[in-house]
Amino acid sequence: MITPQNVFRHEFIGLNVEVINSKHEKFIGIKGIIIDETRNTIRVDTGKNEKLIPKSDVVFLFTLPQGEKVSIDGKVITARPEDRIKKKFTKIR
């Protein structure tokens, strides 16, 4: 089960996400379902089209399957998905 404490160690594909802060204004407000993830980017299906978002420039708001919302700075998750899942993270408040 995905919780706010272990979300970093899970697959992001299929989760709902929204960009809540960014260095570039054009990314703020993008929301949809994650359909692909690479080391540096997340691809989001917005319902109208697909958007490719650089992880390092944004803060994401993930909606977990139970409805909980978790805000994550993209710099923290900039890694290949298979490496991020294995990585140990310090406790996040």
Swiss-Prot record:
Catalytic reaction(s) noted = Endonucleolytic cleavage of RNA, removing 5'-extranucleotides from tRNA precursor
Q: What class of enzyme is it?
A: hydrolase
Q: What is its EC number?
A: 3.1.26.5
> Does Cytoplasm appear among the keywords?
yes
Name the GO cellular-component terms.
Answer: cytoplasm; ribonuclease MRP complex; ribonuclease P complex
Keywords for the protein's UniProt record, in alphabetical order? Cytoplasm, Endonuclease, Hydrolase, Nuclease, tRNA processing
Q: Which GO terms describe its biological process?
A: rRNA processing; tRNA 5'-leader removal
* Function according to Swiss-Prot or TrEMBL: Part of ribonuclease P, a protein complex that generates mature tRNA molecules by cleaving their 5'-ends.
Name of the featured protein: Ribonuclease P protein component 1
Species of the source:
Methanosphaera stadtmanae (strain ATCC 43021 / DSM 3091 / JCM 11832 / MCB-3)
Q: What is the lineage of its organism?
A: Archaea, Methanobacteriati, Methanobacteriota, Methanomada group, Methanobacteria
Gene encoding it?
rnp1
